[in-house]
Structure formats: structure tokens, C-alpha cells
């Protein structure tokens, strides 16, 4: 479901240039407003919520079903996935004959969740699979021949690769040569020539017509497990009738949120139902991590994406890559708490390292590019940076300078491992592939919004020039024409917990289903102050005296933060997202400030 394109020329609240140099526009054109009004009148949906739905492409007839998605109505027949039947049959054979199975996963949240899903399923039928997660630094992404040979030597007669393997020709051939079957379950792009596998289930195969290419790996694994369970039931396997697959949706939801796949169709149902499963705290590992993260209130996508995901990822970034999958497979609460404690420690270490690296990266970027205006691509590089954190740096730099950004970590030999993040409208992956073809990179690839690369230090200057020439014109045009789409206007008195609850029902929000942005027009900035060293806390006051608290995260040094800090007592327009904050056990409304402009 695509979000409607901006077709409205008139600036919302007449904001032509905001603090973040954006033009504010209404998300809805006249046809969209008419659709929202009809939706509200026909289905008795609050008008503001109807505007949110209409602004995200939901039709009038689909509104009620959208607000209550079900797995049953949105899940396709798993056999529509190419090779799903073959994969299910091979898994059933392994279960029926008690084979030694190994699971090879990726080192991110989706990889950990996919590995845990497969492990829990097979363990229910009495198998004890071995999980192998490669080291990010020493082994890199995906199966490698040495690891596959080792798993075969350990006795594995079947290796299931999850969230990887679609292009691992040499590694899968090594497993085949060792007499071990391989089943690949993945969602990454696939080449025209497939690696040697018993089954390769990937909705992004050219010959796959399932239409499920937007699923993360855990979402694909779940469909394979549905098919496998059906086959086991057909064969009257007694244990098959005691397994509730829906109870595993908490892990699927975690992966779906953290892998930032579009929250549409089956993905949205996965998250809605997975959040319900997560609130029961039946997964000892998730429960321990929620406790360690200080979760307050019901589990939300925010908790998955910003509290749980970073902690699981910390293991893969700077510590033991297998910690995340181990945590999600464990049933012993005391053991889960030990692993959760270690992941929390690693996350704090990662945060400290990131803070130092970010300060260095921003200083370099400011020296090289000033405020970034006019630059096509921000490229920063250091020798002492941790390669597991450069992706986070690139994301921060992209947000700070509003331009595509790369962070590159060089090792003592002069080889640099880099990661990049792009802005909407600029295809970073294509630019990186062009640099590979130009001989400037050892290797590189990616997609429109993110890319990875390996470069020799001797080519860094040439690479900067190549990127600048490739991107400057397009990027500066994109920045100059940047707009912020506003879903509607609310006053301080209208920002209520009831509104927050209604907005949550229209969620979850994420990629492909963006969080609603509301404008709070012409309110007096009653109070503004720094929170810590980076965040800006504000209190807005309406003419009737009602107030609304807000916070602009990591904005202190940015133009938005500087504007707010110097606008006390003035009337301003503020744009942001509305949510609930838990303070001393009490829920209260809080505006997450994204932009602002002075009111006439």
C-alpha cells in the first residue's frame, strides 16, 4: 500500500521554510479529504483518525478491516512461496528421523529471531539444533565455507540458513561436498543463478509469485513453519497438535519492527498480533530484556525498535554475535537474566563508543563540509573506529546534515569498512555499485536507502570526489524541495490520552505506514530547557491556558534546537508526533518535536 504522493502546492500554516529547512504541506489533497470524511461518517471513525488512514492509502471500504488485521485473513497459502513445499518436506524428514540439524543465522535482530523461531519449532519435536551466528568482523555476513564444513563435521546432516544464504554459492557447495543438505530461508535479493540447495525459500526470487517480498526473514520462516506443521499434522504427528505457532509471533513482530520492513499486509498483522503475544511475557529472554530495559506499560513497537532491538544488536556489533539468538531460545528465567545483563552491558559499551565516534565524525564533517549545505555526500573516516558501529554513525550524520552520509572504519593495514545511509529520493546502492565498477572500491553494494563498502585508504580521496560528482546535483535539489507532510492540526487541549489510544489502533507505524505528524499552531513557547546535553524539552501554552509538553531528541546543536532555545515567550508553530510518556507510574501525553517555525 503506497502512501499518496504530495500533490498540494499550498503550504500548511503558510510555513514555506521551517527550522529544518522544510516546506510544510498537507498530506491530504482534496480527494483524500473527501475520502477521510466519508470514512468518518460511514464507519463512525474519529475524523482525525480517518485523516490518518486516508493519508496512508486506506480505502473507505477497507478501513474497519485495517483497524483489526488478522493473520488468517492476510496470510497467504505458504505453498505459494517457491520451494516452500520442498523445505517443509525436508524439515519433516529431519524431525521424523531425528537428524542433527544446524541453523546458520545472521548477526542482527532478524537473524537472531529467525534462528530462534526455527530452533523453538524443531526443539518442540525433540531435536536439539546447533545455532551458528558468524562473527561480524572476522567472518562477515552469510555462510562461509569453513563454517559450513565445521557444521558438517559436527554431524549436521541438514543446515538451515536463515536471513542469509541466497547468494552463497561457494559456501553451499562446500556443504554439499561434505554430504550435508542445505535449506535456505531468506528475504534478500537473489541473483539469476541459485546456489546448490535442497530448497531456497525467498519471496524475492525472480520465479516467486507470492507477492510477499516485503517480509523480513522471520516472517518468511514463520510461513515455512506453518507449511511444515500442516504436513506433520497430515502425517498424524501427535506433537504437531500441541504446538501453538501463534505464541511465537512475539519473535516475528520483534524482527519485523527491527528490520524496518514495510508495515503493510501480513507484516502489519504479524506486529499487531505479536505485540499481544509479547505482553504475556511467555518468552523468558524477551521478558528478561524488557525488565533490564526498564519497560513501563504495555509493549509497543517503540519498545521493540528502541529498547530491545539495540540490545540484541549490541551482541552482533561489538560482542558475542550468538547472544541474541541464545536469549530468544532460552526458557530458564535465571539464565535469561544473565544473558540480558550481558547484552545490556554491551549496549552501554556500544553507546559510549558511539558517542565518542559520533563526536569525532561530526567534527570531521563540520571541518570538511561546514553546515553541509551544498555538499552532495558526507564522507567521514577514522582508523580507530569500530566497524560494527559505522552504520549507526552514518545514520546520525544523515539526520544531522540531511544528506547521504558514510562512515568508514580503517584497520591498520589501510582497508576501510564503511556503511552509508541515504535520504529519500537518492539511490545510494546504485552509486556504490557504480564506484565498484569504476575500480574505486574493493567491494560494495546495497539498496536505495543504505549501502556497505570496502575501500583502500589510497582511494579515499578519489572516492569522495566520485560520490560528490555523482550526488551533488540530485541531493541538493532534493534538499531544496524537501517537504514535511502534516496529517492535521491539534491544539494543546486536543492532545489527549484518548487521541493517543486512537492513534495506536491505527498503527503500528513504521516503514510504509509512517507515524502521523501533527502541527500545533501558534502556541506560546512557555518554557524551554536542555535535558542532558543533547535533548531540548519544551512546554507549549495555548490561548486558553492549556499546555502540552514536548521534546526534540538530539536537537541541541541542530538548527531546530537552537531555534527553540532562543524562542522562549514567542508564538511558534510546532510539528511532531503525539505519544504517551510514563512518568512516575502515570501516563501523560508528550509531543515528539520534529520541526518548528515562527508564527506570525
Residue positions per predicted region:
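Mid-to-C-terminal polyanion-binding domains and interfaces
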Residues: 4, 17, 89, 93-97, ...
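Extended, charge-enriched "interface" segments that sit outside catalytic cores
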Residues: 8
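Hydrophobic helix-and-loop "lid/oligomerization" segment in the mid-to-C-terminal part
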Residues: 18-19, 29-35, 39-156, 178-179, ...
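A residue-level signal for conserved active-site and pocket-lining positions in enzyme catalytic cores
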Residues: 53, 160, 313, 503, ...
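Short alpha-helices
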Residues: 117, 193-237, 245-257
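Short gly/pro/ser/thr-enriched loop/turn and capping motifs at secondary-structure boundaries
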Residues: 137-139, 168, 188-193, 207-209, ...
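Short beta-alpha junctions and helix-cap segments that line functional grooves
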Residues: 144-147, 168-172, 185-187, 391-394, ...
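Histidine/acidic-residue-rich, glycine-tolerant segments that coordinate divalent metal ions
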Residues: 162-216
Amino acid at each position: 500500500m503506497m502512501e499518496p504522493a504530495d500533490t498540494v502546492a499550498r503550504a500548511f500554516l503558510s510555513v514555506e521554510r521551517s527550522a529544518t529547512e522544510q516546506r510544510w504541506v498537507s498530506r491530504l489533497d482534496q480527494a483524500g479529504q473527501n475520502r477521510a470524511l466519508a470514512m468518518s461518517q460511514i464507519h463512525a471513525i474519529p475524523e482525525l483518525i480517518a485523516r490518518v488512514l486516508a493519508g496512508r492509502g486506506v480505502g473507505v471500504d477497507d478501513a474497519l478491516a485495517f483497524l483489526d488485521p488478522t493473520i488468517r485473513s492476510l496470510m497467504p497459502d505458504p505453498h505459494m512461496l517457491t520451494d516452500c513445499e520442498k523445505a517443509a518436506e525436508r524439515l519433516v524428514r529431519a524431525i521424523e528421523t531425528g537428524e542433527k540439524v544446524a541453523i546458520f543465522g545472521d548477526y542482527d535482530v532478524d537473524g537472531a529471531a529467525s534462528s530462534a523461531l526455527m530452533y523453538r519449532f524443531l526443539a518442540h519435536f525433540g531435536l536439539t539444533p546447533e545455532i551458528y551466528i558468524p562473527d561480524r568482523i572476522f567472518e562477515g555476513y552469510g555462510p562461509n565455507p569453513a563454517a559450513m564444513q565445521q557444521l558438517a563435521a559436527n554431524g549436521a546432516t541438514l543446515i538451515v540458513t536463515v536471513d542469509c544464504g541466497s547468494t552463497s554459492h561457494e559456501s553451499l557447495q562446500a556443504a554439499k561436498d561434505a554430504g550435508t543438505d542445505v535449506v535456505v530461508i531468506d528475504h534478500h535479493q537473489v541473483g539469476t543463478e541459485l546456489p546448490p540447495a535442497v530448497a531456497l525459500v525467498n519471496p524475492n526470487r525472480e520465479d516467486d509469485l507470492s507477492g510477499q517480498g516485503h517480509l523480513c526473514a522471520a516472517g518468511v520462516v514463520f510461513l515455512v513453519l506453518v507449511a511444515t506443521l500442516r504436513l506433520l499434522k497430515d502425517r498424524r504427528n501427535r506433537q504437531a497438535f500441541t504446538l501453538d505457532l501463534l505464541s511465537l509471533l512475539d519473535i516475528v513482530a520483534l524482527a519485523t519492527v527491527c528490520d524496518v520492513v514495510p508495515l503493510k499486509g501480513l507484516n502489519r498483522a504479524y506486529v499487531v498480533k505479536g505485540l499481544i503475544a509479547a505482553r504475556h511475557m511467555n518468552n523468558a529472554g524477551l521478558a528478561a530484556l524488557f525488565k533490564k530495559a526498564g519497560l513501563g506499560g504495555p509493549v509497543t513497537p517503540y519498545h521493540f525498535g528502541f529498547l530491545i532491538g539495540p540490545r540484541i544488536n549490541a551482541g552482533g556489533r561489538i560482542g558475542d554475535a550468538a547472544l541474541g539468538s541464545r536469549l530468544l531460545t532460552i526458557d530458564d528465567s535465571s539464565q535469561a537474566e544473565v544473558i540480558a545483563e550481558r547484552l545490556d552491558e554491551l549496549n552501554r559499551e556500544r553507546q559510549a563508543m558511539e558517542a565518542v565516534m559520533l563526536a569525532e565524525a561530526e567534527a570531521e564533517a563540520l571541518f570538511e563540509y561546514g553546515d553541509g549545505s551544498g555538499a552532495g555526500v558526507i564522507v567521514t573516516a577514522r582508523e580507530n573506529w569500530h566497524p560494527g558501529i559505522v552504520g549507526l554513525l552514518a545514520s546520525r550524520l544523515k539526520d544531522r546534515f540531511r544528506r547521504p552520509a558514510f562512515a568508514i572504519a580503517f584497520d591498520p593495514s589501510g582497508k576501510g569498512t564503511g556503511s552509508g545511509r541515504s535520504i529519500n529520493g537518492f539511490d545510494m546502492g546504485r552509486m556504490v555499485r557504480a564506484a565498484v565498477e569504476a575500480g574505486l572500491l574493493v567491494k560494495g553494494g546495497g539498496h536505495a536507502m543504505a549501502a556497505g563498502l570496502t575501500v583502500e585508504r589510497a582511494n579515499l580521496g578519489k572516492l569522495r570526489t566520485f560520490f560528490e560528482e555523482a550526488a551533488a546535483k540530485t541531493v541538493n535539489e532534493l534538499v531544496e524541495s524537501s517537504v514535511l507532510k502534516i496529517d492535521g492540526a491539534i491544539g494543546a487541549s486536543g492532545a489527549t490520552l484518548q487521541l493517543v489510544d486512537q492513534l495506536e489502533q491505527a498503527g503500528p507505524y513504521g516503514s510504509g505506514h509512517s507515524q502521523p505528524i501533527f502541527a500545533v499552531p501558534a502556541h506560546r513557547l512557555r518554557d524551554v530547557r536542555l535535558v542532558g546535553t543533547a535533548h531540548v524539552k519544551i512546554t507549549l501554552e495555548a490561548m486558553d491556558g492549556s499546555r502540552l509538553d514536548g521534546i526534540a531528541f538530539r536537537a541541541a546543536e541542530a538548527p531546530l534546537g537552537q531555534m527553540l532555545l532562543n524562542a522562549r515567550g514567542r508564538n511558534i508553530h510546532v510539528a511532531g508526533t503525539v505519544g504517551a510518556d510514563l512518568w512516575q507510574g502515570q501516563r501523560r501525553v508528550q509531543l515528539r518535536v520534529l520541526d518548528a517555525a515562527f508564527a506570525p
